[in-house]
Curated annotation (Swiss-Prot):
Pfam families: Oxidored_q6. It is a peripheral membrane protein. Its cofactor is [4Fe-4S] cluster. InterPro entries: NADH_UbQ_OxRdtase-like_20kDa (IPR006137), NADH_UQ_OxRdtase_20Kd_su (IPR006138). One of its GO terms (cellular component) is plasma membrane. This is NADH-quinone oxidoreductase subunit B. Its EC number is 7.1.1.-. It comes from Nitrobacter winogradskyi (strain ATCC 25391 / DSM 10237 / CIP 104748 / NCIMB 11846 / Nb-255). NDH-1 shuttles electrons from NADH, via FMN and iron-sulfur (Fe-S) centers, to quinones in the respiratory chain. The immediate electron acceptor for the enzyme in this species is believed to be ubiquinone. Couples the redox reaction to proton translocation (for every two electrons transferred, four hydrogen ions are translocated across the cytoplasmic membrane), and thus conserves the redox energy in a proton gradient. GO terms for molecular function: 4 iron, 4 sulfur cluster binding; iron ion binding; NADH dehydrogenase (ubiquinone) activity; NADH:ubiquinone reductase (non-electrogenic) activity; quinone binding. GO terms for biological process: aerobic respiration; electron transport coupled proton transport.
Length: 207
């Protein structure tokens, strides 16, 4: 096995590993290069350019506490799984290696008291509605809700059923709606990124 790895060049401390988004260089993948420019990903981002300028000029930079807290929160969102139907399959898929939502700082938690986001995935029935509200009330502030799929958004296929809530927004306030029946894992991932964008725009200290 070691001989095979040596022939492939994987034992070299400066080996390069190619992947869809660019090239990882170094023993532990110290930098991710953009194949179009050859520079590290995000090097031309105005935010990082300003930070680099401040650090090179003063050795430190001054930022508002709200901006710092918002930055930390968007990179450490813990989500509470609330799978109610087939949408939960796609919700689980977004955590698998193909999408790996944890690389965006979005990790699952089994307790509502440790969660920032609730993903309502599937059909919400009248009997389940009090449990949904109870779990939501146990989440610490600020808390967010992603409504995933047509059934959670508005009842979906069971809209006219006597036993189904016509949208989970009748029970809890919803921040992001992800359409589809069921939505793909890519759609949910896009909704998560939109939630992070909303948090950066609105802030987290007062809500």
């Amino acid at each position: 096995m070691e001989e095979r790895r040596s022939r492939m060049g994987l034992n070299s401390p400066t080996s390069k590993v190619a992947y869809a988004g660019g090239t990882v260089t170094g023993a532990a993948g110290t930098s991710i290069l953009d194949p179009a420019t050859g520079r590290p990903v995000g090097a031309s981002d105005p935010y990082f350019l300003e930070v680099n300028h401040e650090l090179s000029d003063k050795g430190f930079f001054v930022a508002a506490a709200d901006d710092l807290i918002t930055w930390a929160r968007t990179g450490s969102l813990m989500w509470m799984t609330f799978g109610l139907a087939c949408c939960a399959v796609e919700m689980m898929q977004v955590s698998m290696p193909r999408y790996d939502v944890e690389r965006f700082g979005f990790a699952p938690r089994a307790s509502p008291r440790q969660s920032d986001v609730m993903i309502v995935a599937g059909t919400l029935t009248n009997k389940m509605a009090p449990a949904l509200r109870k779990v939501y009330d146990q989440m610490p502030e600020p808390r967010y809700v992603i409504s995933m799929g047509s059934c959670a958004n508005g009842g979906g296929y069971y809209h006219y059923s006597y036993s189904v809530v016509r949208g989970c927004d009748r029970i809890v306030p919803v921040d992001i709606y992800v359409p589809g029946c069921p939505p793909t894992a890519e759609a949910l991932l896009y909704g998560i990124l939109l939630l992070q964008k909303k948090i950066r725009r609105v802030g987290t200290i007062e809500r």
